[in-house]
Amino acid sequence: MPTMKQLIRKTRQPIRNVTKSPALRGCPQRRGTCTRVYTITPKKPNSALRKVARVRLTSGFEITAYIPGIGHNLQEHSVVLVRGGRVKDLPGVRYHIVRGTLDAVGVKDRQQGRSKYGAKKPK
């Protein structure tokens, strides 16, 4: 507990909240261009080949973004929309690619949770 004299000398600093997605620069989404599309393996208890893309954003940042859903059409130079949201078992992956916008097509034959994967309503 500081004394009154200490508080006069140096005031209390407000707690600054640190953003979890700095590359978006406070925007809900950002557009970017894929520089590399590849797979990586998750952390210890899990095992898979997770699809990710290295994306150069319009804000100038180069980030790693997760490609959700089964199957994708992304390749180098694809233009994608990126949103925040980390993948818990992939260290360093703090962004998701939005499916069904720009060059990223929606997931084929998706019945449930379609809005999250850019899938149209089946006829």
From Swiss-Prot:
- GO-annotated biological processes: translation
- GO CC annotation: chloroplast; small ribosomal subunit
Which one Pfam family would you cite for this protein? Ribosom_S12_S23
- Is Iron-sulfur one of the keywords? no
- Major localisation: plastid
Membrane-spanning segments: none
Indicate yes or no for the key word Electron transport.
no
Protein's UniProt name: Small ribosomal subunit protein uS12cz/uS12cy
The record's note on quaternary structure and interaction partners says: Part of the 30S ribosomal subunit.
Family of this protein: Belongs to the universal ribosomal protein uS12 family.
Record function comment = With S4 and S5 plays an important role in translational accuracy. Located at the interface of the 30S and 50S subunits.
> InterPro entries attached here?
NA-bd_OB-fold, Ribosomal_uS12, Ribosomal_uS12_bac
